[in-house]
């Protein structure tokens, strides 16, 4: 059999808990001033089948990116109405249809840019509101399964450089369990900082399942530590390279049918 693990690298996210659905959102930048402009990316968005859209049947409902403020919820008015980052979703019965509609309208990955009401923003994610977004009416709700990515410190920008896949190649059943393969990556930040680096499946689970059963999976590791628990790293500034290792560790119980298997993992920076 042949096994390939695909990797997505993200920065500035809160680590998520296990979920059947998850939207990964990455803050890119935020300017200073009373009315900051933020940039963010929606990197991936998956939904479990059959989950009801929480605002299905409402007279009007919108979804899009916005920030959570220290004082509470956002309004979505700037992001939706002024900058066109949102779609109307009250007509879709399921969350899976909502994700598909957003992907069709905007594309994923999707980069959004918009001005917010205050510099006191804590994180950025996907939000919805079951009426037309209105300036000053801050009652938008975080979309179930959306990561709220922690906004980095002022003037701090970090990036991850990492191969997009780990190729285990052809492996026999007798040598499968415990087999590892690693790739090297680098993190660069404008300022010195301390981070935790996490790895997990793109659906938010601890392991990357490689077939339809839980008996065949990859356990992602960072610097030979559990990707789920995270590895702490001190990062130098001035955009210097700080190396790390990503490892895919295979596990199987029983015989795996020969074939070609792939899975999707995500590597996440969380600022401390």
Sequence positions of predicted segments:
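N-terminal hydrophobic targeting signals that begin at the initiator methionine
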Residues: 1-2, 23
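Bacterial N-terminal signal peptides
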Residues: 2-12
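N-terminal signal peptide c-region/cleavage motif recognized by signal peptidases
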Residues: 13-18
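Mature extracellular/passenger domains of Gram-negative fimbrial/pilin and adhesin proteins
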Residues: 20-272
């Amino acid at each position: 059999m042949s096994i390939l693990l695909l990797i997505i690298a993200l920065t500035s996210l809160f680590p998520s808990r296990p979920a059947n659905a998850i939207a990964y959102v990455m803050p890119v930048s935020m300017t200073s001033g009373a009315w900051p402009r933020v940039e963010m990316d929606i990197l991936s968005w998956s939904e479990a089948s059959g989950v009801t859209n929480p605002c299905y049947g409402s007279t009007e409902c919108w979804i899009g990116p916005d920030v959570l403020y220290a004082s509470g919820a956002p309004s979505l008015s700037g992001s939706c109405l002024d900058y066109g980052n949102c779609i109307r979703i009250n007509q879709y019965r399921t969350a899976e249809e909502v994700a598909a509609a957003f992907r069709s309208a905007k594309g994923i990955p999707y980069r959004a840019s918009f001005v917010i009401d205050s510099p006191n923003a804590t994180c950025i994610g996907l939000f919805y509101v079951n009426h037309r977004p209105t300036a000053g009416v801050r009652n938008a709700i975080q979309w179930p399964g959306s990561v709220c990515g922690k906004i980095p410190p002022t003037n701090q920008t970090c990036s991850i450089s990492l191969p997009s896949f780990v190729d285990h190649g052809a492996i026999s059943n007798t040598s499968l369990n415990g087999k590892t393969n690693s790739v090297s990556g680098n993190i660069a930040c404008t300022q010195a900082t301390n981070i935790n680096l996490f790895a997990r499946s793109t659906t938010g689970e601890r392991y990357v399942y490689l077939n339809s059963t839980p008996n065949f999976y990859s356990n992602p590791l960072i610097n030979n530590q559990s990707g789920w628990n995270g590895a702490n790293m001190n990062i130098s500034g001035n955009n210097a390279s700080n190396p790390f290792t990503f490892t895919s560790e295979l596990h199987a119980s029983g015989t795996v049918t020969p074939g070609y298997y792939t899975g999707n993992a995500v590597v996440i920076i969380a600022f401390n």
